[in-house]
Amino acid sequence: NVFDYELNSDALFTYHDSFANGLHVNASAGGNMMQQSYDMLAASVVGLITPGVYKLANGVSNPNVQTVIKKKALNSLYFTANFAYKDKLFLDVTGRNDWSSTLPKSNRSFFYPSVSVSAVMNELFLMPEPINLLKVRGSFAQVGNDTDPYKTSPYYGTSDFPGSAVVASTLYNQDFKPEISTNYEAGFDLRMFQNRIGLDFTFYYNRTK
């Protein structure tokens, strides 16, 4: 018997405007409330006393009962903003803060942002005639992640003996911190001789801890 569900509640606000100086803005901000629940109850026996009678009481062995209960809550606030100036300069900014029930109280809140910029250099500066396009770009981004439920402190498990429980033998890290992946990217796009020759270059570095 398995009962598994996820409930999400979202709110989102958006803003868009264009200004006379050539600046275009798109922005949004919102939040999410997520709840997960997993309940599993299973029982099995080895062999049947009476063939064809599939009941726990008809097992040759004692019933092996397994119960798994997992619950998780994750609340989030986030924003994103995109700026474009005369289709020459571009800036994208995002940010998100999560509060996870699977982490210790002292580390339950974690924030991860991102910033990316790009510029069409041939629209900003005078370039040699063979160059049709020169666009440079760079970005910084972080992504956060929590863990599964009940990974930070010991808990009682079920036992085959009725009315009893098992003490966990694992030593848990009670200062468990969220996983943060940080990546950097830089590069450029070059098109020359009426787009007959092109070059794309990207440098990428990622670190997770």
Per-range role (PLM):
Residues 1-209:
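Extracellular/periplasmic, surface-exposed regions of secreted and cell-surface proteins
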